[in-house]
From Swiss-Prot:
Protein name: TATA-box-binding protein
InterPro entries assigned: TBP, TBP_archaea, TBP_CS, TBP_dom_sf
PROSITE patterns: TFIID (PS00351)
Family: Belongs to the TBP family.
Keywords, comma-separated and alphabetical: DNA-binding, Repeat, Transcription, Transcription regulation
Gene Ontology BP annotations: DNA-templated transcription initiation
Length: 181
């Protein structure tokens, strides 16, 4: 049975304009914080969808915490509308690029991390971190595997890559099982 994959974080970026007046934007946006001595961007938190948006003077905007690219796009559209309504020169429909997705899943088994740690591309130091770090080259992702069978997959650009990564891991575990047992 295929493990259920849950996307827990999507980070996207876009360009909403140039030379954004962050002081003015902080005044007009609800839930916005701008403290340039601590961070060079404006931080705006939305509750629906629940995301954080980082807006920089250059016009670059990052959205983090979304559960899907669509949620991130909805959040970006909300911010763009507020900024445009306040008279700011903002790009209407900017191209939104996924920078990273994080997914979780349960393998449904309790893998032997010591056995897996013999594979190329793995790091396992249980005294420092309870999970095994497995770097795959295709898809180019990092998978954290825990003794409970839970996995965290980072570096995704699309959800399909999470399924590819899990398929590779499950077939590798099957091969290891045949080799060791």
């Amino acid at each position: 049975m295929e493990p259920e994959i849950k996307i827990v974080n999507v980070v996207v970026s876009t360009q909403i304009g140039t030379d954004i007046d962050l002081e003015y934007a902080a005044d007009i946006l609800d839930n916005a914080e701008y403290e340039p001595e601590q961070f060079p961007g404006l931080v705006c938190r939305l509750s629906d969808p629940k995301v954080a948006l980082l807006i920089f003077r250059s016009g670059k905007l990052n959205c983090t915490g979304a559960k899907s690219k669509e949620d991130a796009e909805i959040a970006i559209k909300k911010i763009i509308k507020e900024l445009k309504d306040a008279g700011m020169d903002i790009i209407d429909n900017p191209e939104v690029n996924v920078q990273n997705m994080v997914a979780t899943a349960d393998l449904g088994i309790e893998p032997n991390l010591d056995d897996i740690s013999t594979l190329e591309g793995t790091e396992y130091e249980p005294e420092q971190f309870p999970g095994l770090v497995y770097r795959l080259s295709d898809p180019k992702v990092v998978v954290l595997i825990f003794g409970s069978g839970k996995v965290v997959i980072t570096g995704l650009k699309k959800k399909d890559d999470a399924y590819l990564a899990l398929d590779k891991i499950l077939s590798t575990l099957k091969e290891l099982e045949e080799e060791y047992y």
